[in-house]
Amino acid sequence: MLNPIVRKFQYGQHTVTLETGIMARQATAAVMVSMDDTAVFVTVVGQKKAKPGQDFFPLTVNYQERTYAAGRIPGSFFRREGRPSEGETLIARLIDRPIRPLFPEGFVNEVQVIATVVSVNPQVNPDIVAMIGASAALSLSGIPFNGPIGAARVGYINDQYVLNPTQDELKESKLDLVVAGTEAAVLMVESEAELLSEDQMLGAVVFGHEQQQVVIQNINELVKEAGKPRWDWQPEPVNEALNARVAALAEARLSDAYRITDKQERYAQVDVIKSETIATLLAEDETLDENELGEILHAIEKNVVRSRVLAGEPRIDGREKDMIRGLDVRTGVLPRTHGSALFTRGETQALVTATLGTARDAQVLDELMGERTDTFLFHYNFPPYSVGETGMVGSPKRREIGHGRLAKRGVLAVMPDMDKFPYTVRVVSEITESNGSSSMASVCGASLALMDAGVPIKAAVAGIAMGLVKEGDNYVVLSDILGDEDHLGDMDFKVAGSRDGISALQMDIKIEGITKEIMQVALNQAKGARLHILGVMEQAINAPRGDISEFAPRIHTIKINPDKIKDVIGKGGSVIRALTEETGTTIEIEDDGTVKIAATDGEKAKHAIRRIEEITAEIEVGRVYTGKVTRIVDFGAFVAIGGGKEGLVHISQIADKRVEKVTDYLQMGQEVPVKVLEVDRQGRIRLSIKEATEQSQPAAAPEAPAAEQGE
């Protein structure tokens, strides 16, 4: 008999159910977590033995959404799920980041977490459910894991924090923040915000951490009922004698090497010291493990840098704790792009471009929660040459997708609304040099490139990466961290925003004991750094350019009667196709009658507008128009009177005397004055040449609304 063990509890406005013991019993642990009809099945498998020579912790997190969860069949050619989407990759990273630091140092057994979304309520995002599931499964598994963790989404609506807001509530929220942590400490924050203050952001982190304690308590209760015995794993005993010997050979030399401010020169010197030290030790005892020696040397490096920072000495590159590296800001660096910028901060550099397109260029995302259209695209590329290495170049890796998403979050809050600026915008950041915080350099470069492209962003934004070194009660917060300070520190803390507030905040904390006060110091120090960078950026460009690039499509907007949309589109799209070919423009029509005409040439746009106005103009009964004969039949002739509208001149209305043969009076293509006698309920038009000739002057084309240019 299958006997499920179930825990059910209230979490904010939702009911959460944890269930184990009924499915995937050959996995190390498996949990089905549901939150109001959104259900995620999470499994964990851990290998009891580490692979020989394994020198890093091989943790893999896979997050996969099944379309059956939403009652749909995949739209792909093969009608089955393919490789992970960008959204799935981002959620896999979201699960990975808070659990990774909770495995003990020295644990290198392979662990795989697989989270599968099996049911989805469109109002409840599965990411928090998956994070809770991963925490529960790891806690049940017996694998050495210092959890459990809780996870919460925090919104900010009407000046109130909201726990786990629904998708509808998120649309009204000024904040979308995910926080994860243990009972004692926050471990990870990922957020985007509409320029909130430092205090509001910190309040959200603290609120989310307090609220998620109920999750941790319930996972602990589930473990008491259904947990597997804890693995009898012990770290390798520390070889104190070997540590001392390595330190005697290398510590002083590494300390000197870390006074070299140039990254490449420093790395070269550190490599020499390491290889010479390892060679000396292997000559003394060839049974020594080279990997173990490498780990000891890395620990010495870490200690050298950390102790120097804590003692108040200058950092690796000679800076004080709150100093920003030298900045170089240039805009308009590429002649044919719509907007471009080169942003350099020390040895980190980003070449960023902005490209404007029409609504047709927007990305349609067929997601589990429903289809949505994205009109702001942000792509981040990290080629191997940026760190002086060779390597594969191809589709973006998980890290590039994650960094691109963070940079996008940093800029999103200042992007103009589509009704004010009806363009799809794509920003691409090419990292040309990297030594710390290339994602935040991408935010700065994006802000500059967008202004260079004439995109009316609400404010300039900049980003900065902060670090932390902490031993006991002694701690130092570092501004604008280098790559080495990121690896060797206890916290990586990225903040983007304008002068008025924060647009994105990302935190990854590797230790417990980071208090609210420490986070407050880091946020305030980050604000000072952000304002300094914005000041330098404003010297290069302090407002969006007054006009878009001559190479960008100009979008002109006119309004037509929604009833006339069918006339502009035509049967099977024939009219709109002919219009785009005739005028050389791109034409998009919305359901409310908004027509957007995109063209790089103003004259072409005017021509397209004129043609659309002709097609949509109302035909006035009693008015005389100049028309062209398009068809001749026995009972009369059809005459086009502009805008693709055609009316019938009956044989009795051709002349004021009896007409025996229509062709005696009219020829194909002949221009004739016609008077509109009637437009019937079906839109058919009756015309008269006889009555028109009695009136002296034909009327001009009907008036239509003037175009507005969407700049």
Swiss-Prot record:
Mg(2+) binds at residues 486, 492. It comes from the Bacteria. GO terms for cellular component: cytosol. It is found in: Cytoplasm. Residues 694-711 have a biased composition (Low complexity). Gene3D superfamilies: GHMP Kinase, N-terminal domain (3.30.230.70), K Homology domain, type 1 (3.30.1370.10), Nucleic acid-binding proteins (2.40.50.140). CDD domains: KH-I_PNPase, RNase_PH_PNPase_1, RNase_PH_PNPase_2, S1_PNPase. Residues 622-690 form the S1 motif domain. Residues 553-612 form the KH domain. One of its GO terms (molecular function) is 3'-5'-RNA exonuclease activity. Keywords: Cytoplasm, Magnesium, Metal-binding, Nucleotidyltransferase, RNA-binding, Transferase. Pfam families: KH_1, PNPase, RNase_PH, RNase_PH_C, S1. GO terms for biological process: mRNA catabolic process; RNA processing. The keyword ATP-binding does not apply. Residues 689-711 are annotated as: Disordered. The keyword Lipid metabolism does not apply. It catalyses: RNA(n+1) + phosphate = RNA(n) + a ribonucleoside 5'-diphosphate. It is an enzyme of class 2 (transferase). Belongs to the polyribonucleotide nucleotidyltransferase family. NCBIfam families: polynuc_phos, PRK11824.1. Involved in mRNA degradation. Catalyzes the phosphorolysis of single-stranded polyribonucleotides processively in the 3'- to 5'-direction. This is Polyribonucleotide nucleotidyltransferase.
